């Protein structure tokens, strides 16, 4: 397992960069809102060296390109990109490992005199990074108890148990993600508090003074775009991509195999549904995930919101630059 991958070399500028220009930017929002395009436009308009860090847990996996809408290597060549293609599909992505590796990457970029731009929508991963989450201890016996309960009643029923104990946690954890469901129940039992209570509130200063920009994308605008994007993924070869990755260890039991689109295609390949049903289920799952992302991010008062319906990355990037200038001068 190698989290350290960077797409392109970095060069340190001469002289010392003012501290304010080293503050990371974090671009968040629901899937399909245009975060990656915006990150590139902002990087082009900043009058300083910039390096980009991936904040999408599934884009960390090698070969998972079509179904994650990952920028191509050619698109990533314009600026150094980090934490893309750094895991094999049979590796387990971890919030704690991401916090540590992305944090080290931020500080290495700053040491080179460049500004980090973090871009993605993986909710807990990003908050763990910018708020330096400290994770509660684990207890093997408690975890084993909840895993046994999952085996007894099934993962979807266990998700309902989580909802009864902590509705907010159930809203953000996918109902078919047994590892995170079990972990949340473990934390709740060990601490006697809701899962999120073990983490810092969202109204405290961010780590490194990170500035957060969010793309606001209402469902009536985003949902048709998401369906069209799913259609493009299937047309571009998502099924063949999944078939190839299956030979490299992608399975429904792996973390990568639970990614939206990949899980549905794996079910179809196993004969459990038609490929058309897999496409429809992918659309439904993507829309549900976008709703969870919107719910998570709108609770953070530190986010400066941008209107994704403008659908013009250049115009939105200009708004980001203007906001940075105003707050710096103010």
Swiss-Prot record:
Domain of life per record = Bacteria
Gene3D superfamilies given in the database record = 1.10.20.140, P-loop containing nucleotide triphosphate hydrolases
Residues covered by region (Interaction with substrate tRNA): 56-59
EC no.? Answer: 2.5.1.75
GO terms under biological process: tRNA modification
Pfam families annotated for this entry? IPPT
Q: Which residues bind ATP?
A: 29-36
Q: Where is this region: Disordered?
A: 1-21
* Cofactors, names only: Mg(2+)
GO MF terms, alphabetically ordered: ATP binding; tRNA dimethylallyltransferase activity
Ranges annotated as biased composition (Polar residues): 1-11
Q: Where is this site: Interaction with substrate tRNA?
A: 122, 143
For substrate, which residues are the binding ones? Answer: 31-36
Q: Which UniProt keywords apply?
A: ATP-binding, Magnesium, Nucleotide-binding, Transferase, tRNA processing
**Reactions it catalyzes:** adenosine(37) in tRNA + dimethylallyl diphosphate = N(6)-dimethylallyladenosine(37) in tRNA + diphosphate
- What quaternary arrangement does the UniProt entry report? Monomer.
- What PANTHER family would the database entry show? TRNA DIMETHYLALLYLTRANSFERASE
Q: What functional role does this protein have?
A: Catalyzes the transfer of a dimethylallyl group onto the adenine at position 37 in tRNAs that read codons beginning with uridine, leading to the formation of N6-(dimethylallyl)adenosine (i(6)A).
Q: Which family does it belong to?
A: Belongs to the IPP transferase family.
Under what name is this protein listed?
tRNA dimethylallyltransferase
Tell me the organism.
Corynebacterium urealyticum (strain ATCC 43042 / DSM 7109)
